[in-house]
Amino acid sequence: MSAFSEAINSLFSGHYADPFSLLGMHHSSKGLEVRALLPDADAAWVVDASNGRKIVELERVDGRGFFCGLVPNRKHDFHYQLAVTWREETWVIEDPYRFGPLLQDMDIWLLAEGTHLRPYERLGAHLETLDGVEGTRFAVWAPNAQRVSVVGQFNFWDGRRHPMRLRKENGIWELFLPDVKAGQLYKYEMIDSHGSVRLKADPYAFEAQMRPDTASLITPLPEKVPTNEARREANSLRSPISIYEVHLGSWRRHTDNNFWLSYQELANQLIDYVQYMGFTHVELMPINEHPFDGSWGYQPLGLYAPTRRFGTASDFRAFVDALHGAGINVLLDWVPGHFPGDEYGLAQFDGTALYEYSDPREGYHQDWNTLIYNYGRHEVRNYLAGNALFWMERYGIDGLRVDAVASMIYRDYSRSEGEWVPNHYGGKENLEAIAFLRYTNHTLGHAAPAAITLAEESTDYPGVTLPPDCNGLGFHYKWNMGWMHDTLTYMQLDPVHRKHHHDLLTFGMLYAYSENFVLPLSHDEVVHGKRSLLDRMPGDVWQKFANLRAYYGFMWAYPGKKLLFMGCEFAQGREWNHDASLDWHLLDEPEGWHRGVQALVRDLNHYYRQQPSLYQLDFQPQGFEWLVVDDRENSVFAFIRRDEQGNEVLVVSNFTPVPRYGYRIGINQPGGWREVMNTDSVHYNGSDQGNVGTIYSEEWGSHQRQHSLVLTIPPLATLYLVKEA
């Protein structure tokens, strides 16, 4: 058998790795020759594209559909087409193998180095016009594959028809397919390093099918979203930030069939509600395409594709635009820490551990049965860092909350001795993950300066919110998991025992300025048997609601930005269920308990946003001062929040069901004070005890201060007071 025949056999068996060396137009010793792989075709002609005339009929040298022939009277390459007959129908098509290399040298170098700012502009499927021909350019990184083909609705999912060109410089396979349009489904069929056939979704796909289907969808790269100063300022350390954490699939559902709301329906309903409640930001639990509903999106396989559960990519873009139009900033939960091992995804992508660490002690996450990204690989770092910029630049996302940072930066996270591999210094830190986070945050700081990143980091790793050039990780904010844990532990105690655990509410101020903190009451606190926030409060019904209201009042006044998971704003009684709507019926009673909590959260948000003392100096010690810190017996706390002009808000909390009458508190500024917030108000279904009118200070020393106020502190309540002008 000749080498030419062997090459043809390899093409049809799908094992020919260099199709451009054989197919298309070539200068041979015989002259200008055209060769075409057209499985099952009956006949083929070369057509001059400039005038539509047939020049020469190609010979079918292999009955399976391989054609070749010499072009008479031509010495130079020209724009040709193929007129192909299948079953008595003739089609004039462009030959994808007449186009030259697609990736430029600079792109190849940057992608191999892992520093391409926007890898999504070069990899994946892109609608383009080349040499006057409309089509789609495909590119995928699979350096160890023996052959990669584009398959889809446009070629009967036949891997023989469109094998790709390998760019050996960086292991990227590329191909331009004429007349392939937006809306068509595709995948990559490859023969991996072991000779096995794999069918993979595109890691850089901008849209995908809804589960259980797994194909990628050709979609235009979204246009860039311009930033504006208002959105930038809303993210700043000196601004009020109150975040409403939302799972789009269960915030609200259709009552007739329990089906999800679409992005458009969410835009119509969620935005009005968020505005009414006074939240400044919405944080969306992961909307990247993911195969398993029960993962809540935290096991994504389509990092560049908004999930189709609620609509198209353009629908999601319109949803974000609508939020911005309403003055609401949008944060996304982002999961660069791990990915599921589904066959069609990133796992063993080209037959090797390409995206993941090869050693399971590094690359397997036993808590979640997922795989861990290999942060030391340049192309993987580029894939993830580019994705962060993609959401900010192409969808206008205002920030990313990075999930499970501790699991990324510690090699021994949730592992016993012998189950992890030390770094090259012998330590437990994952230096590659740390370098990745620093690189990503540094890159975003330059490329998307209006956006922010927030870390869910559950350890005391130092410098999470310090800049990378100061040896920090470079985040803008860090979730204060310690505050959340300590305060919830305190609130779950019977009030009679709280005096023995007084320091649970005071300890947080010892480290409050070590990072830029967000106070999170997230979805993690209302699942897996932890019970709802309301159900965790002690006492009878009245005490449960009073405890929760007092806690919210304390939280909104405490230094740090705020985050509350959906349903907690009206004290949902059961744990969160991702398969059902929130219990909105609890609000049907106009004067009910749940309405009271909802009204309180709304008032807290609106007052917080108009009172700079509660947010302007969140991360500076002069913005906070304890007044009463040691009254264990009465479980009373009092502190001052202060703005840059020295204006003060006095905050007093009583965490026992015993009202405190005639309670004296030393103050800094003598004069008349007025109660502006009382979580025990009748408006919130409280007992309506408190302080009416102006309360004048007395020149009576207390708490190391010359002047003091005498207050009535309601049971299980938090008060805010301000000095009269």
Swiss-Prot record:
SUPFAM superfamilies: (Trans)glycosidases, E set domains, Glycosyl hydrolase domain
Keywords, ordered alphabetically: Carbohydrate metabolism, Glycogen biosynthesis, Glycogen metabolism, Glycosyltransferase, Transferase
Listed CDD domains: AmyAc_Glg_BE, E_set_GBE_prok_N
UniProt pathway annotation: Glycan biosynthesis; glycogen biosynthesis
EC number(s) from the headed UniProt entry: 2.4.1.18
Catalytic reaction(s) noted: Transfers a segment of a (1->4)-alpha-D-glucan chain to a primary hydroxy group in a similar glucan chain
Listed GO biological process terms: glycogen biosynthetic process
GO molecular function, one term: cation binding
Enzyme class: transferase
GO cellular component terms attached to this protein's record: cytosol
Known role: Catalyzes the formation of the alpha-1,6-glucosidic linkages in glycogen by scission of a 1,4-alpha-linked oligosaccharide from growing alpha-1,4-glucan chains and the subsequent attachment of the oligosaccharide to the alpha-1,6 position.
Family per similarity comment: Belongs to the glycosyl hydrolase 13 family. GlgB subfamily.
Assembly behavior: Monomer.
Protein known as: 1,4-alpha-glucan branching enzyme GlgB
Organism: Pectobacterium atrosepticum (strain SCRI 1043 / ATCC BAA-672)
